[in-house]
A protein has these predicted regions:
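Intrinsic disorder at enzyme termini
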Residues: 1-32, 37
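Catalytic cores of phosphodiester-bond-cleaving enzymes
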Residues: 6, 45-46
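Glycine-rich flavin
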Residues: 16, 49-137
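Short hydrophobic motif
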Residues: 33, 40, 44-45, 74
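Short low-complexity stretches enriched in small and charged residues
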Residues: 35-39, 80-83
């Protein structure tokens, strides 16, 4: 007995394929995905991977000043919050694009934190954006 292969969604995906539904259209990122992935890899190699031994061996509070500097640089380089729409300071990636960026970030434990897309905060940001009061947003 053979099991049919699952059908794939169209390239654009369903309306909720965007990181946060209701904002920019899917694929409305500011730069092509291959260029973004190259930038993220370079940023990890240059700034995040050198901190990995400290992240793994030291108390978080002791590494936090260095991580804050890395996060500020990520924001300055335009790599901040890939899951959020550009209107909120994010990259406006589709869910598929964000998945590819996440795969790169997952190469180091500090990768998602460096770009402000670590669990569980990512989901909280999306929920607050969609359903939070103005003060919460």
């Amino acid at each position: 007995m053979t099991v049919p292969a699952p059908t794939l969604l169209p390239a654009a995906g369903p309306p909720h394929a965007h990181g946060v539904p209701g904002d920019e259209a899917p694929g409305d990122a500011a730069r092509p995905l291959p260029a973004l992935l190259a930038e993220v890899r370079a940023f990890l190699r240059e700034r995040v991977l050198p901190l990995e031994p400290r992240v793994l061996q030291e108390e978080f509070r002791d590494v936090l000043p260095a991580l804050r500097a890395v996060r500020a640089e990520a924001k300055a380089r335009g790599l901040w919050a890939p899951h959020l729409p550009r209107s909120l300071g994010g990259l406006g990636l589709t869910l598929r694009e964000y998945a590819e960026v996440s795969a790169v970030l997952g190469e180091t434990p500090a990768g998602p934190y460096a770009l402000n897309c670590q669990a569980p905060d990512v989901g909280n940001m999306e929920l607050l954006h969609q359903f939070g009061t103005p003060e919460q947003q």
